[in-house]
Design a protein with these regions (language model features):
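Active-site rim/loop-helix segments in enzyme catalytic domains that contact anionic ligands
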Residues: 1-101
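Metal-dependent de-N-acetylase/amidase catalytic core
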Residues: 2-9, 85-188
Length: 188
């Protein structure tokens, strides 16, 4: 893999790390830049009885620890888990991060899912990818066209998903295993 910047975007912290984490780790091993963006913290997945605000802070720390392991970056937007708005405010927030990060590759959710936030995230990212590339959408940063936009699935996004790209991530797999262990869900 030539040195590239890969931006993996998920509806929740943990989504990108699971669906594209090994790709991000492989990118990092080869000198590229690995970046995650979560549109929500995924705080509604808190264990029974847990304080939601405290759990949210913990999830953000997990995202940062994962990114640090890859010498990358983690961004988390401040939208509520389960209630991700399907609007241009979110699309332009994602557009701005695309323009800031300047990825060669973006990976996000497949269009079908049992989780509404994953479906909305897919639509947001497709539009934000377009907005980021068009100079006519005046923003603080100049346009950037990410040459490749790929879709990944996890167990929630499998309906209708047909794999169409396979990447050898074996060089980064050990690093991904180490990084994913920073996530509570991976060790409990």
């Amino acid at each position: 893999m030539k040195t590239q910047t890969v931006l993996a975007i998920g509806a929740h912290i943990g989504d990108a790390e699971l669906t594209a984490g090994a790709l991000l780790a492989s990118c990092a091993v080869h000198g590229g830049k690995a970046v995650t963006l979560a549109l929500t913290a995924g705080e509604k997945g808190a264990p029974a009885g847990a304080d939601i605000a405290e759990y949210r802070r913990g999830k953000i720390a997990e995202a940062e620890a994962f990114a640090k392991e890859l010498e990358g970056e983690a961004y988390v937007l401040d939208y509520e888990d389960g209630l991700l708005p399907d609007n241009d405010e979110v699309r332009f927030a994602v557009c701005d991060i695309i323009r800031k990060v300047k990825p060669d590759i973006i990976v996000t959710h497949h269009e079908n899912s049992m989780h509404k936030d994953h479906i909305v995230c897919h639509r947001i990212v497709v539009d934000a990818w377009f907005y980021a590339a068009i100079e006519g959408f005046q923003r603080e940063l100049p346009k950037h066209f990410a040459k490749k936009l790929y879709f990944a699935e996890n167990w929630e996004d499998a309906p209708g998903f047909e794999p169409y790209v396979y990447v050898d991530v074996s060089d980064g797999y050990a690093l991904w295993e180490k990084a994913i262990d920073h996530h509570w869900f991976a060790v409990h």
